[in-house]
């Protein structure tokens, strides 16, 4: 069975070198072109999907739509879910990465960004940009909405969606596209590939490039490659 991951195309805050997380920013022209290229590659390689999963953030949704349009599959069902959102970067969201390193030191920022189980400082729930004040999360219990996450917590958030939605779709024989974010996809990759806590820190997923998994009947990875 086939599973394809695509990290959203290059975003406005990727271009500005800002911590993004759950902040909702748009694609750049480069990001749009990356998504178009991904869709064309999938079309040329003969990939057909039965269902697509994405987050509730604009950059991932738009990437999904563009990829499906370019591959002539915009009509297939799409499921949007908050569990596929990017890792929440807490109080770092909206800050310049270079300036943050100058303020707190390279080592501290590296720990916040790359350690598996250490989170950055929480974002104040009363902050106007907090997810607690965003109506797309109004249906969630307050204690479920994060104020900051590390990759371990991100995996704990993403995994129920894998088990409840993505894995059952694959086991039912559906061909699945997941268009999401660097860290939510890294979390899924860690789970399905069995990557260790230490090794996952070295895994990078580039923007806008289809990552193909061939899986056996037990959802074990048989083959993995980029188009």
UniProtKB/Swiss-Prot annotation:
Catalysed reactions, as listed in the record: (2R)-2-phosphoglycerate = (2R)-3-phosphoglycerate
Keywords: Gluconeogenesis, Glycolysis, Isomerase
Residues that bind substrate: 7-14, 20-21, 59, 86-89, 97, 113-114, 182-183
GO terms, biological process: gluconeogenesis; glycolytic process
CDD domains noted in UniProt: HP_PGM_like (cd07067)
UniProt-annotated catalytic positions: 8, 86
Pathway(s) it belongs to: Carbohydrate degradation; glycolysis; pyruvate from D-glyceraldehyde 3-phosphate: step 3/5
Enzyme Commission number(s) of this protein: 5.4.2.11
SMART domains in UniProt: PGAM
Site (Transition state stabilizer): 181
Molecular function per GO: phosphoglycerate mutase activity
InterPro entries (UniProt xref): His_Pase_superF_clade-1 (IPR013078), His_PPase_superfam (IPR029033), Phosphogly_mut1 (IPR005952)
NCBIfam families hit by this protein: pgm_1, PRK14115.1, PRK14118.1
Quaternary structure (record): Homodimer.
Family of this protein: Belongs to the phosphoglycerate mutase family. BPG-dependent PGAM subfamily.
Role summary: Catalyzes the interconversion of 2-phosphoglycerate and 3-phosphoglycerate.
Record-given protein name: 2,3-bisphosphoglycerate-dependent phosphoglycerate mutase
């Amino acid at each position: 069975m086939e599973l394809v991951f695509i990290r959203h195309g290059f975003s406005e805050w990727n271009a500005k070198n800002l911590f993004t997380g759950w902040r909702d920013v748009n694609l750049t022209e480069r990001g749009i072109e990356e998504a178009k290229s991904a869709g064309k590659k999938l079309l040329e390689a003969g990939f057909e999907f039965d269902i697509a999963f994405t987050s509730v953030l604009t950059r991932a949704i738009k990437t999904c739509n563009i990829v499906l349009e370019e591959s002539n599959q915009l009509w297939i069902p799409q499921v949007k879910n908050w569990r596929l959102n990017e890792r929440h970067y807490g109080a770092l969201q909206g800050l310049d990465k270079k300036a943050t390193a100058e303020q707190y030191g390279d080592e501290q920022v590296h720990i916040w960004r790359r350690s598996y189980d250490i989170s950055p400082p929480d974002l104040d729930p009363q902050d106007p940009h907090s997810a607690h004040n965003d109506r797309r999360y109004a249906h969630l219990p307050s204690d479920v909405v994060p104020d900051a996450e590390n990759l371990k917590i991100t995996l704990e958030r993403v995994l129920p969606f894998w088990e409840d939605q993505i894995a059952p779709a694959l086991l039912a024989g559906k061909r699945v596209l997941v268009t999401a974010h660097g860290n939510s996809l890294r979390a899924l990759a860690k789970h399905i590939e069995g990557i260790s806590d230490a090794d996952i820190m070295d895994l990078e997923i580039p923007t806008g490039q289809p990552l193909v998994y061939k899986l056996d009947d037990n959802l074990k990875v048989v083959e993995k490659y980029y188009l």
